Amino acid sequence: RNTKGLNIYAPTYQSHYAFRLAVTALVTSALYEAGGEHPNVQDALKESEAYLLEHLPKLRRATADAMYNVWAHSYGLQALIRLRARALAAKDAPKVKRIEAVIATQFDRLTRYESVDGGWGYYDFRLGTKKPASSSISFVNATVLVAFDEARKAGIKPPQRLVTRAIAALKRQHLPDGSFLYGEYLKMAPRRGINRPAGSLGRTQVGNLALRLWEDKRITDKVIVDWLDRLFARNEWLGIGRKRPVPHEAWFQIAGYFYYYGHYYAGLLMDHVPDKDRPRLQDHLATTLMKLQEKDGDWWDFPLYDYHRQYGTAMALLALHKCLRKPEK
């Protein structure tokens, strides 16, 4: 409706249900992390909590070939973990129990929609089977693994089989130069533009983060810092796709929606860089994002129906929150 009719494939209402829930979850996490204690923020969190608790358990894939719901289950988990912490702080035991029940449904859906190859994809153009034959997609696997780590750290154990298979699938797509394949279906074309370092720039941050969280020793401090430096030094390889309405039309087949996604996970990596590197990397990230804030205060990178301003702003805020200096003791 704000995109001049240039929109991505979204069959049946469940596609938009998935978009809406994923974006609501991201905004919920952003408000929780960066919104402060203002009454309006607390009211918004109450409303989003009620929406997520009611609707996340109802979400399914849209059709046999379109599974955007995997994004909502992943970002939904991250929001639910934060809402659970909020309920624990308020000593609201019934609310904690209800949130944990919904978390269990998200584990169930991610089990149900896991690719036969391990990990997840959001399209199954192969067979459209009950157990998806979708190609395992590197950045989807990494996104889910980051959410699973948050659950694990909150004392809620994700299904081990899913974790093991997703890590294996992500490692299969990790190239010797540090890039990540877009998806396993491209394993026979590792030097195609989209799979080269510039094409992987928005994916490598989340891939590095996921493997680091799940204790892959190859993801050293140096690897993380080098790829963050590349993100800032070569930012326009990613930025040239920003706001272009056709997915993958930019250099190295980069789609616009990787811009704030990549910077969001770059923000999360700030917790994993050496103290000596953190201030300059935080400054690079903050400067990069603040220069791109729109006149009305939001951020967006790809015209996705009516969801782009919300998800872009949420990801930018979550990244900027990680750029704040910790007060000196």
Annotate each predicted stretch with a short phrase.
Residues 1-329:
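Preference for long, amphipathic alpha-helical scaffolds in soluble/luminal domains
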